[in-house]
Amino acid sequence: MDEFHRNGKEDSSWQQCFLYPLFFQEDLYAIYHDHYLDGSSSSEPMEHVSSNDQFSFLTVKRLIGQIRQQNHSIVLFVNCDPNPLVERNKSSYYESVLEGLTLVLEVPFSIRSKYSVEGINEWKSFRSIHSIFPFLEDKFPHSNYISDTRIPYSIHPEILVRTFRRWIRDAPSLHPLRSVLYEYRNSPENLQRSIIVAPRVNTRFFLFLWNHYVYECESILVPLLKRSSHLRSLSHGSFPERTHFDRKIKHIIIFSRRNSLKRIWSLKDPNIHYFRYGERSIIAIKGTHLLVKKCRYHLPIFRQCYFHLWSEPYRVCSHQLSKNCSSSLGYFLRIRMKPLLVRTKMLDELFIADLITGEFDPIVPIVPIIGLLAREKFCDISGRPISKLSWTSLTDDDILDRFDRIWRNLFHYYSGSFGRDGLYRIKYILSLSCAKTLACKHKSTIRVVRKELGPELFKKSFSKEREFDSPPFSSKAAARSQRERIWHSDIPQINPLANSWQKIQDLKIENLFDQ
């Protein structure tokens, strides 16, 4: 990739005029073929790999030539041959064509995103989802409104081609892309439907289409939002006197004009903050009521006219932070009013000011998560633990490992919430369900299982709190841990239980609009 970039410095038009010959490079398909055999980059089951023994690069080139012919367009996504062996061979070649197309288009896209996006006002993307929460903790308390938008994942093929045509002028390379997209759209399974482009589609081709489309939207929207702000994203947490000044300005005494030498101005600095995870993008706005109304009116129009994002009403939600809370990333996001006492001593006088500051307070949805555990047969609908019968065929270590993994991931993900008391209720459900599962497997009772296994039963499982419960940490440290946030930087995606609850919340909003 670096070699491509060095060559691009010498000739800036290489990525626009010389993409099509790369389709016929056998090395690209050899890379995909090796990954396909290893099962590392293909979504097909491993039992289908055995039919790829007679792989021919010449056949792949012929298929590419057939894509160029509109009258003899091949069906890439639907195979009508009843022979399963022939169908698997066809599927392997079609997947190779798509993989080659993806690899070729990824070369200029990767270089463009790497060397241009990071240079736009130091805007960078993070790998850990928990990198979003410190940002929210710093920016949300100083915002008035938020606009929560779910990016549409049904896009017309021609819109995708237009986004590529903005930075690729190589018409022969765009022609196969257009043919593939329309071939997929006109298949019997997707007739009269748009292209499904979303991170939930687990193929490299559609993941690339999704990343490219989102990048095109954000590369224009994010710099525009930054230019619309008068100030950079700064924290006002270290300026309590400014808050005190804004509070007292409401009760200021108006002097006569002849006695006042200067005018007092109370300026509110507008700021707009943006973050996205998956298909959800949130814009937090701080400013006057007029600015908020303008943003709520112009942003949907801007998306529709420039990006062709025709969002349904239920996919766009706007509300005031101080009065409502929103559900995102598996949390209830809200702003909690926190009293702050400031004492100022000047000579022999002591001034005390009572301030009210906003604090970012994400809430863990305990009751919905318990409902999800009941759906997975860890407990009943009232939260009473039951045995996981489907795991009784596993070994004791596997059972302990699975329960431990569920609790550890859940505790890691929700460790940034202040109110973690509800998490220990979930811990109780999982620990007792683990004991009942082992007792059901050995056809005994929980007391007998604990007596036979002794302290080794829960030595490995549910040990995340050792950093708080171990002797080196005092009770004060344990109490302090309840008031501190711990955002882990090794969480690449949303917790499965939190993600399931978030989908249920989105479905409820969609049903409200349908009614």
From Swiss-Prot:
The gene is matK. It comes from Larix laricina (Tamarack). Keywords: Chloroplast, mRNA processing, Plastid, RNA-binding, tRNA processing. It is found in: Plastid, Chloroplast. It comes from the Eukaryota. GO terms for molecular function: RNA binding. Belongs to the intron maturase 2 family. MatK subfamily. Usually encoded in the trnK tRNA gene intron. Probably assists in splicing its own and other chloroplast group II introns. This is Maturase K. It holds the Pfam family Intron_maturas2. The keyword RNA-binding applies. The keyword NADP does not apply. GO terms for biological process: mRNA processing; RNA splicing; tRNA processing. GO terms for cellular component: chloroplast.
